[in-house]
Amino acid sequence: MMSNRSDFIVPDEAAVKRAASVNFHLEPLRPWLDDPQITEVCVNRPGEVFCERASAWEYYAVPNLDYEHLISLGTATARFVDQDISDSRPVLSAILPMGERIQIVRPPACEHGTISVTIRKPSFTRRTLEDYAQQGFFKHVRPMSKSLTPFEQELLALKEAGDYMSFLRRAVQLERVIVVAGETGSGKTTLMKALMQEIPFDQRLITIEDVPELFLPDHPNHVHLFYPSEAKEEENAPVTAATLLRSCLRMKPTRILLAELRGGETYDFINVAASGHGGSITSCHAGSCELTFERLALMVLQNRQGRQLPYEIIRRLLYLVVDVVVHVHNGVHDGTGRHISEVWYDPNTKRALSLQHSEKTQ
């Protein structure tokens, strides 16, 4: 049977030129894009490249990778996928001509004079179950149990002993999800920055804030993302805390640091934290540790998707996802000054809720 010529898709000349333009602008990154051992290629700012090889990050200086070249790469990529990237639409998700996934963020959604480029290379590795077994892939499966893990027992012992400095340090090191709560002027952001200093310096960090406060002088592999304070998801603003949280999922963060939860983006934060991104740190306004969960639940309900969930389900999700709540207070009336007033850490409740849900679904 003869095939009709319309069965064959022939790229038009314009599409070929657009693909060629993208590949031309990718040339400074070609050594790492062509390296089969590299899984991720990231540009946080002009002149530098971070690559992931065997779950470890490597740094390379690339002097010819200047700001203008990165802007042109973004423009060429947007044209290739028939999208837009500009000051008014500064975030772009696309697939490159060779199949790599790319995420580009330009100002004002990131620091002025910088552009964030994250390229995820597709994996062509094929493994059998026997290959996994030989690599020890199945040796560390933990049965669902009411008993706490050694790390949970360690943290609980530190908290019960009142050694809160060591408790917080280990909570950060063990990648627990931490919420710092308190009233305005209580020192939430200052404590957040102290906790961030306990994060290993070789991790890739992404901050999300409306005002630049979360500086990371000791963590070279970082990206600062920004959104306008008045931006609201319901009003279809192009850049909000929620859109940047979703963008983070394509930027290979080890941790996401969100300066403050204020509204519907709380739903996205919980969703991201529940997806396996441990070690996130954020803050919110609340009068106590217990009220923190009430505040977070109310803010989840400000999200269109969050409103579809029953309040009880939201509360259970919060207890499952949030590991530590630290409440800070400014005792201006009693002379105690800024201090931690409460610490919530209850792995037993978390474990019971998890087992309860598991039993219901069986």
From Swiss-Prot:
Keywords for the protein's UniProt record, in alphabetical order: ATP-binding, Cytoplasm, Nucleotide-binding, Virulence
Source taxon at top rank: Bacteria
Main subcellular localisation: cytoplasm
GO cellular component terms, semicolon-separated: cytoplasm; type IV secretion system complex
Molecular function per GO: ATP binding; ATP hydrolysis activity
Subcellular location: Cytoplasm
Binding site for ATP: G182, E183, T184, G185, S186, G187, K188, T189
General function of this protein: The virB operon is essential for intracellular survival and is not involved in the invasion process. Constitutes a major determinant of virulence in mice. Virb11 is essential for pathogenesis in mice but is not required for intracellular survival.
Keyword ATP-binding tagged: yes
PANTHER family for this protein: TWITCHING MOTILITY PROTEIN PILT, TYPE IV PILUS RETRACTATION ATPASE PILT
Any one of the GO BP annotations: secretion by the type IV secretion system
Note: Transcription is turned on at the beginning of the stationary phase of vegetative growth.
Pfam families recorded: T2SSE (PF00437)
Taxonomic classification: Bacteria, Pseudomonadati, Pseudomonadota, Alphaproteobacteria, Hyphomicrobiales
Protein name from the UniProt record: Type IV secretion system protein VirB11
CDD domains (alphabetical): VirB11-like_ATPase (cd01130)
Sequence similarity: Belongs to the GSP E family.
